[in-house]
């Protein structure tokens, strides 16, 4: 996986925060990069009993504008999947335009994404 040194720390922090919030992480799918996330998200939403999905990763700036295109498409597609399956899909993917150092400084985005997913699940249940 791209930038596994960073995403591993995000995963650990996200799991700890989920446990703190009383949520369980029942399934984890590792993707080679953020470009591959939408398919994994769709599989998780269609297979099994999933209340929400949290995406964790980082998009680091390269020599071209590729990072901006990937970030734009990723956010759009996971938003589409959330709406299509009526389940929260939280974005824990900082970027684009970041250096590796900036990505390391944003590892706590994992906590924010987990918290957003848990809050959305609770709020959606309140409305039904």
Where are the regions that the model predicts?
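Short, ordered loop/turn segments at secondary-structure junctions
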Residues: 1-2, 57-59, 93-97
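Glycine-rich phosphate/diphosphate-binding loop of Rossmann-like nucleotide-binding domains
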Residues: 1-30
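Short beta->alpha junction loops
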Residues: 26-35, 95
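Glycine-rich phosphate-binding loop
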Residues: 39-78
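Short, acidic/small-residue loops that bind anionic groups at enzyme active sites
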Residues: 70-95
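Phosphate-binding/catalytic loops
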Residues: 96-108
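A charged, well-structured terminal subsegment
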Residues: 107-128
